[in-house]
Amino acid sequence: MKQIIYLDNAATTKTRPEVVDAMLPYFTEFYGNPSSVYDFSAEPKKAIAHARETIAGALGAKPNEIYFTNGGTESDNWALIATAEAYQNKGNHIITTKIEHHAILHTCEYLENRGFSVTYLDVDEYGVVKLDELKKAIRPETILISVMFANNEIGTVQPIKEIGEIADKNGILFHTDAVQAFGHVPINVDECHIDMLSSSAHKLNG
């Protein structure tokens, strides 16, 4: 096979050998259901708890705030749909941007078909959200703001802390799709006022 120079790591990454080595025992030896009560479940249960603590530490979060899904798309779907359903008695308005991943945009379309209102913000020539436009888009019935941390096509990093502060000041939940950012730039969910964050291991050699 000829040598390949792979330049699409923003789409997915090669799993690092040490990750394969770390995971292999749970495919071949400690494969018990971690939610079960028998002894065979103890080792995978311990591994999941350790992974949860590690991820929480990397985000400045608490271990009980970390949930595992099958990937970034499910995480995005869950964040938006669960928030919309849980807060629909408070409001039905969601703010996002026109340059989000399809996992966000398609979910917003789904919610619009269910009666929710979605504002899609424009960005400037560099792909950055205009904070003044964000502030203008907020309504009394706004329940969620969802803005990706870093864009998967052009690499723009959004002013997440400032967006989080605006959301927090207005009592609005803030979600960020950080699939392209986690593991590459420092993230502290408390400092950035992030209520929900999506990430995915396959973007960082996992």
Where are these regions (language model features)?
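Pyridoxal 5′-phosphate
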Residues: 1-206
